[in-house]
Amino acid sequence: MRSLVEVINENLIYEVREKVYSKDVSGVTEFCNDVLSGDNWKVNKDLSVDIDKTSGSGYDMSFVFPNNVTKIPDFIKFKGRDVSIALTTSGPYNKNIEEFNLNFDGTLSTVTVNNVPKLKEITINDVQIESIFIDKCAKLETIDLSGCEVTDSACARKNKSLKTYKAPDLGKKVNTYNIDNPGYTDELYIMDGVRYKRDEKGKLVKI
């Protein structure tokens, strides 16, 4: 005969309820307190969030999504100049985020997304990005950078579930471009500013 503990464990359902933020200054402030690791931000009356450059060597905007937050509310827009961003697995954080839809007004310097286990979609709106790196996100299916302009580097590698990739515009001085994933590999490849095309066998041919 099974014990009472075994019966309870069999029928116990663990549910993480998605946190809902109100569409007002207090809701956006609460989101930033929950999700941004630093304090270099300010919420405006129009619900936009100003991000200041930090004086240290770290990222200006590090996301640390708790388990009950899986995306950025669509009414939040971030603003800043030459802002660096990180979304990586960090301790107990970023384990359940599924969508990273970044609405940004200004310019981005470095964007790093690495090893986020449940992330399925990355969308960044029309913005200039110096360098972006998206690596080792096992469930990532879609990257949408259409409308963005990359000026130095764009790399997306070892994202084994990637199916859809919408490329950014590439500036004339792009130094590195490497979109190489099991499900999707871009035929264009740039190394040290030299452009190549991958032929039908994957061999690089200088353009």
Enumerate the predicted regions with their spans.
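Canonical position 11/12 of the leucine-rich repeat
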Residues: V69, D82-S84, N96-I97, G106-L108, ...
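Canonical leucine-rich repeat
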Residues: F63, I72, I85-A86, F100, ...
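Short hydrophobic transmembrane-like helices used for membrane targeting/insertion
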Residues: V5-I8, I97, I122, I129, ...
